Amino acid sequence: MNENNIERENSMQCETVGTAVTDRVEVTDKSNDPYAYLERSEFTSEKFKIEIRNLPKYYGFNELKKLLKSKLNLNPTKIKTPAPKGGWSYVCFKSEEEKATALKILNGYTWKKQTLIAQEAKAVPDPLVKKRNLKSSDSNISSKRVKLDVKDLLEQLESKNNQIRMSLKKFSNELIKANPELSKWCKQQESKYNNLPCELLPIRHSNVINGYRNKCEFSIGINESTGERTVGFRLGSYVEGSVSVGPIDEVLNVPETMKIAAKSFEKFVQNSKYDVFSPELHKGYWKQLTVRYGFRTNELMLIVGLDPQQLTSEELCNLKNDIEKYFKEGDGSSCPVHSLYLQQIKKRKSQDDVPALEHVFGETYITEKILGKTFRISPQAFFQVNSNATDILYESIGELAGLKNNVTLLDVCCGTGTIGLCLAEKCNEVLGLEMTAEAIADARVNADLNGVKNAEFFVGKAEDVLSSVAYKAKNEEIVAIVDPPRAGLPCDHRKAVKNFVDLGRATSKIYKGEPFLPVKAIPVDLFPHTPHCELITYFER
């Protein structure tokens, strides 16, 4: 899903306040020119963008990517299809030479019986400058302070439950259209389960609804109303015309330990000779602070993100030493840091660029406990953001799966193995598969850490190794679990309806075997004070 530059956001959007310091970045006399960024020295793919028109009516994003990269040997840095079935797409490259080559190859090329038209595309205006030019002088965005939804808990749960009911009802209607043979079955289910295709159990939640997040990514920037350097949350997006950062003091789902850590590093940034990063001018250094926290182990990890700009290796080394000294001996020593990393976040030249991580001091990981088991959390490892509610989530998964000692649990896209390892004692064996080798290494360590002997983990893409891994199962009865988001599998239950429908399609060359039909669903609220909610749905065939 990162191919389409879409990010899952289960957290909140809020902001922070900071303090003015010397060495501020000055806005140039072209500050109101929305195209001034094209004249700067830093890389932007907008300089080398083309537009492809007359695309086929039916094609997939991955098909287009494969055509460009594999068949035509082009090297795009970004592919954007603004409108589904719109017949056109933008493609960006690293250089003028690569752009010219692409234009020559693509213009007049025939694909799926369509003759493509390729031409140079105009760069988009800087959205921040564009919005700023449109704002009246008295519309000060920094006067806003975004807070989380503070509805009563019962009101939040009722709202989420209603959204889930709507999604399941839509699923039932779409399933009948896709597989008319199931019409009678759907009507019977709806009469039995209050117009729903399956039983929907009451929404489950943790009693801890404030300060529950075990991971937060704080922005580092300037609060426009005070001029102070601040570690907190963006008040709005760049596209909305805001780069201001606001305070986290009143943000409900950030725990006190994280607030103390953020404020501590904020003091370091305010006293630093290096300025905060400017998203508009691409100057400055301090960009982000990621905080991870083990509630049950009281272990804290900090990941300091900065743009190194033109800093020498010696200057970076000195900066790293300053951070270490601050948290070990200076004012930051009151904040007990278990693990600290420095991350160099440079401007990405392609979607495959991964910011480099450098371990500064402490352990290379922290740990957290789920359902009594201990799990290692590396800096970039996925881990559910609400530890207390994750206990409830995993217990509910085990309940729905109906695991027994003659069942194989197939943990698809298992990550670091948390689900499978928590449920291992309820089944005969666990087989986990995951495309990221580092995650599989963590999963194996976690299995050893918890003395789990009936779990094996395999590296590979699900579509490539699922059949071979399933073939290893010792039992005829197999229960598969998949935890989105994955490519083609959204995490939002409203967007996942298509996947549900595909599971219930009639047997064909594409859809082999009998259809999977919904049996029971359980909502679990992992994200109080936000509109998001997890939905576990159990299908059988």
Region locations from a protein language model:
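Low-complexity RS/RG/RGG-rich segments used by eukaryotic RNA-binding proteins and nuclear co-regulators
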Residues: 110-131
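Rossmann-like S-adenosyl-L-methionine
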Residues: 3-18, 24-27, 55-71, 77, ...
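Short hydrophobic/aromatic beta-strand micro-patches
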Residues: 53, 90-94, 219, 292, ...
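Short hydrophobic/aromatic beta-strand or adjacent loop that forms the aromatic wall/cage
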Residues: 88, 215, 532-536
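Extended interfacial segments that mediate partner engagement and assembly in macromolecular machines
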Residues: 141-278
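Internal alpha/beta scaffold segment
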Residues: 241-281, 285-287, 308-348
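Canonical RRM/RBD RNA-binding surface and closely related RRM-like beta-sheet modules
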Residues: 33-38, 46-88, 93-103, 111-112
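Short beta-strand micro-motifs enriched in acidic
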Residues: 82, 206, 219-225, 292-296, ...
